[in-house]
């Protein structure tokens, strides 16, 4: 009994020593605090290299979340004094210690009130001490390098107001000097609350030499330099304004005495806007026009060719000398000539027969070289013309091209175009829609059909009595033969819709034949949809993404077929190179690929990949039955599999394991049933060996052991066995504290909690380890590096080990960029990185545009676009992200328009000069168009005079706050032409899709202009087809012409000038189809009691089909709309149209009134009286003869 007690005492002492291996023996030992200071993109850090298992508790004040690795790490904010408090394991005392990082940080010594407020900034830990900077022009970022240049920081600053300040409220104005002179001025309006102004050259870095004002708030005599102006105000404190004083030139005016046109000379005159009385005049400067490449001796009536490359200006020596090589002042402007097309004047002559050619006569402009091609042909050979007359057949698309302008238009010689109506007949969405398409006067067209191409297939739909019924959404080619045409014509109706709602779509796959290394797998996919089922057979070696275009509609179905692994049915080709022997139970085997087209990519034995030994040219496989899979790769991937049995020369131990059931007194056991056949057996654990006598060994702790077995005295081999722990003695519960936020292999940033009870008691001092890793954690049951998926953990306590698989899922954060301040002008835009998961700790951003400050992370952008950046977080995660950045700065694509303007067009083409008036000039420092300066009118208005015609003008402007950008003007104004002229248009709408609409044009001048009508409907497969309007058409009286028989659609009426390129007019006309209406009801009232009222109903449409008129409540009905013998009362007439294009019913009320006497007859002319008198005399004679005859008989 005494010996047993001593044994228990020794066991307790051993356990106590093992437990306290994790406990500090010195409870008062101070920690070694390792501080790393922030430098460039990394924050300051505190690291403690002591094992995390040494502490009962540890914490920073102010609180900072630690990063748990095998040690503690914290990210710190510079400028904060911290305390660290900690208590060692098995100790009761708490130790506290102050510390602070020494990374650089700053404090603003003044508030950034306005954009240009001058701000003193104090930077700490810059070197041995601090340093002060003066900062201005916010929003921007402070960027400071340390004294030794090894570290830096960057931080965003934005002002409290973007709208206040000496620039924004117009209190500061400056005018640059005339080139070569010192007459620049700066004016400060002190009445707006400004004072204490000081001016320096920017090159005066120490601000020692102040420039004195000429008078209060006014500087004069300034030369072209860069200046720094300091101005004080209550609203913005001290502002620092950078003024770039540029040379100013007197605007040069150009007067077009005839309109600029391509490829021939124009006449221009030049003058200075300041006249000849200013500093500069035509006697001391030299003007030039660089197209003629000469200086002008006379500025008036200059003959020169003008193109879009023409520029003009003037130059002079700064001292007005005539010596060569002196410093020059040069001013130039570019002519914004933008030739407007089309510029083709032609007339068309067509026959009533389609078999006769179309004759087209062209009237070229000067220097115009016209070629005509077949638009649908790929030959590139133009048609031959004689004397500018072209004869071509009907139903062609012609490409009319000017080789000098490098521009062309399309004209279609289609013989006849059917009218049609399209009505949706389904309630579907997207490509599931269906339509009825009705062709007007379909009897006039032969071979009507809808031709449709879908993927590599063709489909045709045919009409029933001119109606294509329930046609799916398509891009229709409606083909036909018109009249006596032998050539087929077509027009296009676009009802294509790629939106494929998948709610009612089912994909079914059927593998028809599994492939092998040389033949693809064949499968069939069946699409079940609202249009029925459709099947398609495909072949593939791999997983296949596919798109199926359903027949007869525009729906395309996307899917993916997961191909089975391709297995080769042949046997493996292999060779056994060695036999098992005493030194190895493995056999060296070599595999051969089935053909020279394939190579062996990998070999697996019982699901475990085998290592290839280059020096031996083979693989080792173990004795016994082996399921071998050999993977091949060539043009595709495939595999062969086979069972290979290797007979072992020697026996192996047959092992039976008894688990550990007592963690304090290990009682695991290994038994070997065939121990008699071995020469010797021994157990190896942690490099220590112990003999196995009588075939068993006991009192083992849980763990992995190696059994060495000797077949004879010299032949030794080994096997590995694992002794588990009994599940009956422990209660283990696991839970996921947080899922990993990145998929970083088996070790990520997920956290798993493990709770252990042994013999009913809660256990705290156990370890957790991943079975595949060397990381061991004793952290109150927390495993902090869990990966995505299954985490195989071992839980160890005393002599016991248990295994658990815990599954986690990916909880990946998203990162977005949140704008810190608005981007303005050329200043940078700063965005802050924001995570969707506030619990993660960002480590750094890896980007050329990135920086961090005080544990916040930023990106800087100068323009719009898609930008990429890497983000690292939680010490273990790292990923690449992209985000689209759309800047709000000033550019021509911005929705913000700052320039208010008016465009004054000339009255007509005789003086084609454009004036552009700026009406808010007081909002800008400067405005230019290709260096051209406007002429001031007053404080708010200025004018660009005599601009050459162009589709638009790009104005370069500088706002009062210094922002420089472009704004494009004139696009909308010039769509209708360059003059104030108009074409008077009266249109009549189409009715019932009859194609009978008309367009009446007035104010036409066929002597000086030519006219197009541009059809924007898709015709012969081409949109924007041009047709010439010819003066010989009917209705051409006094400049008025009537265009008849037009279908519903969008048209443009275009007028071009016969003598110049840019004088055009363009007007949009939209024709819609309307239902008929009751145009009039003519009523004759009933008199006395005769019930003799009448009515006549007329429509605004003469249908070729019967129209039924019926008076409701009576038996009266007919097809001419005339009714008589009506009694006095109110009636309702109902009109029913049987027209197939618009089967509508109309109704309207009318009233027959009762009159007491007939209306007074209107006076008759003598011929009417004579006719009545003769009629009476004839009747009296006839009556006398009748009486006499009766008397005789």
Curated annotation (Swiss-Prot):
Localization, UniProt: Membrane
Membrane protein topology class: Single-pass type I membrane protein
Signal sequence annotation: 1-25
Carbohydrate-modified residues: 90, 183, 226, 265, 281, 345, 357, 436, 516, 552, 583, 627, 712, 765, 822, 938, 1038, 1092
Membrane side Extracellular: residue ranges: 26-1172
This protein's UniProt keywords: Glycoprotein, Membrane, Signal, Transmembrane, Transmembrane helix
Residue spans crossing the bilayer: 1173-1193
Keyword Oxidoreductase: no
GO cellular component labels: membrane
Superkingdom: Eukaryota
Organism: Dictyostelium discoideum (Social amoeba)
Record-given protein name: Putative uncharacterized protein DDB_G0271238
Nucleotide-binding in keyword set: no
């Amino acid at each position: 009994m005494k010996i047993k007690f001593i044994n228990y005492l020794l066991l307790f002492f051993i356990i106590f020593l093992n437990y306290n291996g994790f406990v500090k023996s010195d409870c008062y030992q101070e920690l070694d605090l390792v501080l790393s200071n922030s430098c460039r993109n990394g924050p300051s850090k505190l690291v403690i290299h002591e094992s995390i298992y040494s502490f009962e508790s540890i914490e920073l004040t102010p609180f900072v979340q630690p990063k748990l690795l095998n040690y503690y790490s914290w990210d710190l904010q510079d400028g904060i004094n911290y305390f660290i408090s900690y208590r060692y394991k098995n100790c009761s005392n708490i130790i506290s210690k102050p510390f602070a990082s020494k990374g650089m940080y700053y404090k603003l010594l003044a508030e950034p009130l306005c954009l240009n407020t001058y701000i003193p900034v104090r930077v700490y830990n810059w070197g041995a001490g601090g340093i002060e900077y003066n900062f201005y022009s916010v929003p921007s970022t402070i960027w400071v390098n340390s004294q030794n240049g090894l570290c830096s920081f960057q931080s965003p600053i934005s002002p409290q107001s973007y709208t206040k300040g000496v620039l924004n409220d117009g209190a500061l104005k400056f005018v640059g000097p005339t080139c070569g002179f010192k007459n620049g001025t700066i004016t400060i309006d002190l009445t707006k609350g400004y004072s204490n102004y000081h001016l320096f050259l920017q090159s005066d870095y120490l601000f020692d030499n102040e420039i004195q004002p000429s008078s209060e708030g006014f500087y004069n005599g300034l030369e072209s330099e860069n200046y720094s102006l300091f101005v004080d105000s209550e609203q913005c404190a001290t502002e620092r304004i950078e003024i770039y004083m540029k040379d100013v030139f007197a605007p040069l005016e150009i007067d077009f005495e005839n309109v600029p046109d391509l490829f021939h000379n124009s006449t221009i005159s030049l003058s200075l806007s300041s006249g000849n009385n200013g500093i500069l005049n035509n006697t001391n400067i030299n003007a030039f026009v660089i197209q003629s490449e000469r200086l002008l001796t006379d500025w008036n009536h200059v003959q020169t060719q003008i193109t879009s490359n023409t520029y003009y200006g003037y130059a002079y020596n700064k001292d007005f000398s005539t010596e060569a090589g002196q410093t020059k002042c040069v001013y130039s402007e570019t002519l914004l000539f933008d030739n407007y097309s089309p510029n083709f004047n032609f007339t068309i002559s067509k026959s009533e027969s389609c078999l006769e050619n179309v004759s087209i006569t062209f009237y070229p402009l000067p220097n115009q070289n016209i070629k005509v091609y077949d638009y649908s042909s790929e030959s590139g050979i133009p048609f031959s013309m004689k004397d500018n007359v072209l004869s071509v057949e009907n139903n062609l698309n012609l490409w009319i091209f000017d080789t000098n302008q490098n521009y062309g238009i399309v004209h279609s010689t289609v013989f006849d175009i059917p009218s049609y109506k399209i009505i949706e007949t389904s309630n579907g969405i997207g490509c599931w829609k269906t339509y009825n398409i009705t062709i007007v006067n379909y009897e006039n067209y032969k071979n009507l059909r809808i031709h449709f191409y879908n993927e590599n297939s063709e489909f045709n739909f045919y009409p029933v009595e001119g109606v294509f019924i329930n046609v799916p959404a398509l891009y229709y080619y409606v083909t036909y033969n018109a009249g006596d045409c032998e050539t087929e014509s077509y027009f296009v109706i676009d009802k294509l819709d790629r939106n494929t709602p998948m709610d009612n779509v089912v994909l079914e796959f059927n593998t028809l034949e599994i492939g092998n290394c040389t033949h693809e797998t064949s499968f069939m996919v069946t699409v079940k949809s609202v249009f029925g089922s459709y099947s398609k057979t495909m072949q593939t070696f791999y997983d296949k993404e596919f798109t199926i275009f359903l027949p007869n509609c525009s729906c395309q179905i996307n899917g993916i077929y997961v191909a089975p692994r391709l297995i080769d049915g042949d046997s493996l080709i292999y060779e056994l190179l060695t036999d098992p022997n005493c030194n190895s139970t493995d056999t060296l085997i070599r595999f051969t690929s089935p053909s020279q087209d394939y190579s062996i990519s990998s070999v697996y034995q019982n699901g475990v990949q085998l290592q290839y030994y280059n020096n031996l040219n083979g693989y080792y496989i173990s004795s016994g039955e082996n399921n071998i899979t050999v993977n091949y790769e060539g043009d595709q991937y495939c595999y062969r599999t086979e069972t290979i049995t290797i007979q072992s020369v020697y026996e192996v131990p047959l092992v039976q394991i008894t688990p550990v059931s007592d963690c304090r007194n290990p009682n695991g056991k290994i038994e070997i049933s065939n121990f008699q056949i071995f020469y010797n057996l021994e157990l190896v654990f942690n490099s220590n060996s112990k003999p196995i006598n009588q075939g068993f060994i006991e009192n083992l702790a849980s763990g992995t052991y190696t059994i060495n077995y000797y077949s004879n005295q010299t032949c030794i081999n080994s096997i590995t066995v694992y002794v588990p722990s009994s599940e009956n003695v422990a209660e283990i519960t696991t839970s996921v504290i947080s899922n990993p936020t990145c998929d970083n292999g088996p070790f990520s940033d997920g956290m798993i909690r493990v709770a252990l009870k042994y013999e009913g008691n809660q256990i705290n001092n156990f370890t957790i380890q991943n079975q595949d890793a060397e990381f061991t954690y004793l952290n109150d049951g927390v495993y902090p590096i869990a990966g995505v998926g299954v985490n195989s953990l071992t839980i160890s306590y005393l002599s016991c080990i248990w295994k658990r698989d815990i599954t986690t899922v990916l909880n990946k954060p998203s990162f977005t960029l949140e704008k810190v301040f608005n981007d303005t002008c050329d200043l940078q835009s700063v965005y802050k990185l924001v995570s969707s998961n506030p619990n993660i700790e960002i480590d750094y951003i890896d980007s050329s545009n990135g920086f961090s400050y005080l544990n916040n992370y930023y990106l800087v952008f100068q323009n719009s676009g898609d930008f990429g950046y890497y983000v690292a977080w939680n010490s273990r995660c790292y990923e690449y992200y992209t985000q689209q950045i759309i800047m709000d700065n000033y550019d021509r694509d911005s929705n913000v328009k700052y320039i208010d303007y008016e465009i004054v067009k000339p009255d007509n083409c005789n003086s084609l000069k454009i004036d552009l008036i700026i009406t808010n000039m007081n909002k800008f420092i400067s405005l230019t168009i290709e260096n051209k300066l406007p002429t001031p009118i007053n404080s708010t208005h200025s004018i660009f005079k005599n601009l050459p015609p162009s589709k638009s003008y790009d104005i370069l402007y500088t706002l009062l706050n210094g922002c420089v950008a472009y704004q494009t003007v004139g696009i909308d104004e010039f769509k209708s032409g360059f003059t104030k002229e108009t074409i008077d248009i009266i249109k009549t709408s189409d009715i019932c899709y009859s194609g009978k609409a008309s367009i009446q044009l007035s104010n036409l001048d066929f002597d000086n202009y030519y006219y197009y009508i541009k059809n924007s409907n898709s015709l012969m497969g081409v949109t924007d087809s041009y047709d010439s309007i010819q003066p010989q058409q009917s209705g051409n009286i006094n400049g008025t012409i009537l265009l008849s028989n037009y279908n519903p659609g969008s048209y443009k009426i275009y007028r071009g000038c016969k003598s110049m390129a840019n004088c055009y007019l363009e007007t949009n006309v939209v024709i819609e189809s309307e239902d008929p209406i009751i145009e009039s009801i003519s009523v004759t009232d009933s008199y006395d009691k005769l019930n003799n009222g009448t009515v006549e109903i007329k429509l605004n449409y003469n249908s070729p089909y019967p129209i039924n008129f019926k008076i409701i409540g009576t038996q009266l009905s007919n097809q001419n709309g005339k009714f008589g013998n009506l009694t006095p009362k109110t009636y309702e007439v109902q009109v029913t149209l049987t027209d197939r294009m618009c089967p509508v019913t109309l109704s309207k009320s009318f009233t027959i009134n009762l009159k007491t006497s007939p209306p007074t007859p209107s006076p008759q002319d003598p011929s009417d009286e004579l006719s009545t008198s003769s009629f009476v005399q004839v009747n009296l004679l006839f009556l006398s003869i009748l009486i006499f005859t009766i008397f005789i008989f």
